[in-house]
Amino acid sequence: MSEVYLGNPNLKKANTQIEFTQENILEFLKCKDDPVYFARKYIKIVSLDSGLVPFNMYKFQEKLIRNFHENRFNICKMPRQTGKSTTCVSYLLHYAVFNDNVNIAILANKASTAQDLLGRLQLAYENLPSWMQQGIISWNKRSLELENGSKISANSTSSSAVRGGSYNVIFLDEFAFIPNHIADDFFASVYPTI
């Protein structure tokens, strides 16, 4: 029986037995404790010039990840093209892999933008070593579920985007482009869920 998820050799299906070496265990624990180390060593991104490359972070990106890890609420007002979305995605992946039963929402001004961010996260996940991956329960363009119970969904920002759920992390991308009347309704419906 195959140990890959739906024929994708880069994804481990749920309930796959893995033999951990002592080195794997120590590395897993180090990554769990240090999301910056995890991102530097294991996150892969697509570069326009070089294709798939390691995520070589700047100091401000490391600081962002540490702030996310140490503080429940974060607001970042930053310029374009600074790698902030990639930085956020690397932290969200860390959070989902190393914490059981967490719910994460990736929301953006357009569903396609949120799905693109989820796609970046999925690409990074596919490039993790199999011993670090959680098995896959479901995997598509709008959501994924890992065997540790963690779930990530991608939607457009609206007052009903996350209604009916409880979320450990809500990542709002391009929030400045959300009309005020939608933003107000969104916060009224979302704030009780976090």
Residue ranges and their predicted role:
Residues S2-I194:
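Phosphate/NTP-binding elements of NTP-utilizing enzymes
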